[in-house]
Amino acid sequence: MAMLYAARHLDLRAITTVYGNQTLEKVTRNALALCRLARLDAPVAAGAAKPLLGEGPKDVTIHGKTGIDGAELPEPDRAPLDIHAVELILRTARAHRGELVLAATGALTNVALALSTEPKLKDWLRAITIMGGSTGIGNSTEVAEFNIHVDPEAADMVLRAGVPTWVVGLDVTRRVGVTAEQIASLREGGRLARTMADLLDFFLDSLRRVHGLNTASLHDPCALVPFIDPGLIEYRHTSVRVELAGTLTRGMTVAELRRLGSTQLGHIRPSAAPNVHLAREPSPRLVPHILAAIREMDVRAT
């Protein structure tokens, strides 16, 4: 949200929530609390409480029991809209045809439901940008990233929808992290910056214990990069598909990273048609850009 706030050419039109790091109720409450903290008035609607098939994840504590542990947030000063997130997505896309970028930083269930509810949505959207997947090591499993793994059917539907799509996975976002020293520097700011520091400290501690990492990965802000400053991440137009059936690989994102020539051998499977712009390399400017956006939002929220 800080990056959106700092980008003068973008306008936050709506916020939707989905199950994931915690229950839908907790995630929605967190969104409303953060809106109050940052003085954001965008409408908020709760969405899916579980994936398209089966039940949602249980006992997800990487962000604590509330889904956003580590800081004391203000009590929400409003309730979510009395409509489902899918309806808010459709209303917003219908009102801003050809302009709306749908940024998905959690499970893709709401997006898949919206696309299946209104087939015209794919033509109304300017783009979809996703934080999810990995071309290497996963986090939920050895090869699957959490946001895709919790609802691979939804992810598969979204990637096949034909909407211009940008994807940034763990192999990139894990290289976009803040150190303990950078987190400490945020404490020199106001309430919002100090709250972000508290949240990042908690997350860094969790990542150290669970994954042995020494930086707090800034996963979600990376999804917004192509529409804020395309030079902050290098992308490749290629194919990404979701594994739905593998016993060990369900939820894995399979990306075409080969450089096949014009000569094909019978034992080599040809490339699928490109369907996404896949993040490959973050710029050294990205972390300073995100920290500067947090500081700017902190000043405006004071």
Language-model regions, residue ranges each:
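A residue-level signal for conserved active-site and pocket-lining positions in enzyme catalytic cores
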Residues: V44, V158, L224
